[in-house]
Amino acid sequence: MKKLKLHGFNNLTKSLSFCIYDICYAKTAEERDGYIAYIDELYNANRLTEILSETCSIIGANILNIARQDYEPQGASVTILVSEEPVDPKLIDKTEHPGPLPETVVAHLDKSHICVHTYPESHPEGGLCTFRADIEVSTCGVISPLKALNYLIHQLESDIVTIDYRVRGFTRDINGMKHFIDHEINSIQNFMSDDMKALYDMVDVNVYQENIFHTKMLLKEFDLKHYMFHTKPEDLTDSERQEITAALWKEMREIYYGRNMPAV
């Protein structure tokens, strides 16, 4: 895409939001409580603040304010307000490729924010536990928050990821013509590294004329031992392993497709 000469500030708003899910099987009530306590501590407000602060570093934002809170009985939220950092637009990379892990990228941001909320969840029947984190990176300026996507997904390793990216508003060039997007994008997948693409099955649902892009990701490899909390698969009977595997896989497919499915 040809570089634009703008009249004034770049008024486009670029928002990246995604949900990550971690699935676990806990055999007893004590194990379920233990998993919730473990995942709640792993992604507490302090750790999330570190991750989001590093995200700000990647996209070159100045942190204005940090609001963070751990909740009882579980969950956490962090919101960071960031400000613009002047930069020569000629230095901004607008090509479609994966972002750093991490690597300094200079950005020009204004009226922007980064936030995350966590939602640990379990049910007394079935032994299934889920952890969901909602993350949003919203910027107003010349760089897309997609540059932080690669880093964030690697930091929050998960079984299922749903990603939405949208460009809103318009900016004008020096001739007064409106521009509703200022960079090329065909798929969110083009901003992911090859190792990530190898790990997940992905599907896109894009509405190009509205500048809306959506990608869903489901982990390819399924190893039961990675989904058990304080229970070893070898300590279970064959029928128990099959039953738990079927329950976990059904849970993951329901979350991935966003609908309830009949038992197989």
Swiss-Prot record:
Allosterically activated by metal cations, which are absolutely required for activity. The presumed physiological activator is Mg(2+), but can also be activated in vitro by other divalent cations such as Mn(2+), Fe(2+) and Ca(2+), by the monovalent cation Li(+), and by trivalent cations such as Eu(3+), Tb(3+) and Gd(3+). Competitively inhibited by methylglyoxal bis-guanylhydrazone. Also inhibited by Zn(2+), inhibition may be due to interaction with the active site cysteine. Inactivated by treatment with the imine reductant NaCNBH(3) only in the presence of substrate. GO terms for biological process: self proteolysis; spermidine biosynthetic process. GO terms for molecular function: adenosylmethionine decarboxylase activity; magnesium ion binding. Transmembrane segments: none annotated. It catalyses: S-adenosyl-L-methionine + H(+) = S-adenosyl 3-(methylsulfanyl)propylamine + CO2. It comes from the Bacteria. The active site is at S112, H117, C140. Is synthesized initially as an inactive proenzyme. Formation of the active enzyme involves a self-maturation process in which the active site pyruvoyl group is generated from an internal serine residue via an autocatalytic post-translational modification. Two non-identical subunits are generated from the proenzyme in this reaction, and the pyruvate is formed at the N-terminus of the alpha chain, which is derived from the carboxyl end of the proenzyme. The modification Pyruvic acid (Ser) is found at S112. Its EC number is 4.1.1.50. Pathway: Amine and polyamine biosynthesis; S-adenosylmethioninamine biosynthesis; S-adenosylmethioninamine from S-adenosyl-L-methionine: step 1/1. Binds 1 pyruvoyl group covalently per subunit. InterPro entries: AdoMetDC_fam_prok, S-AdoMet_deCO2ase_bac, S-AdoMet_deCO2ase_core. Optimum pH is 7.4. Active from pH 6.7 to 8.5. The keyword S-adenosyl-L-methionine applies. GO terms for cellular component: cytosol. Keywords: Allosteric enzyme, Autocatalytic cleavage, Decarboxylase, Lyase, Magnesium, Polyamine biosynthesis, Pyruvate, S-adenosyl-L-methionine, Schiff base, Spermidine biosynthesis, Zymogen. Its cofactor is pyruvate. The record marks K111, S112 as: Cleavage (non-hydrolytic). Catalyzes the decarboxylation of S-adenosylmethionine to S-adenosylmethioninamine (dcAdoMet), the propylamine donor required for the synthesis of the polyamines spermine and spermidine from the diamine putrescine. Heterooctamer of four alpha and four beta chains arranged as a tetramer of alpha/beta heterodimers. Spermidine-deficient mutants show a small decrease in growth rate and increased sensibility to superoxide toxicity. Belongs to the prokaryotic AdoMetDC family. Type 2 subfamily. This is S-adenosylmethionine decarboxylase proenzyme. The lineage of its organism: Bacteria, Pseudomonadati, Pseudomonadota, Gammaproteobacteria, Enterobacterales. The gene is speD.
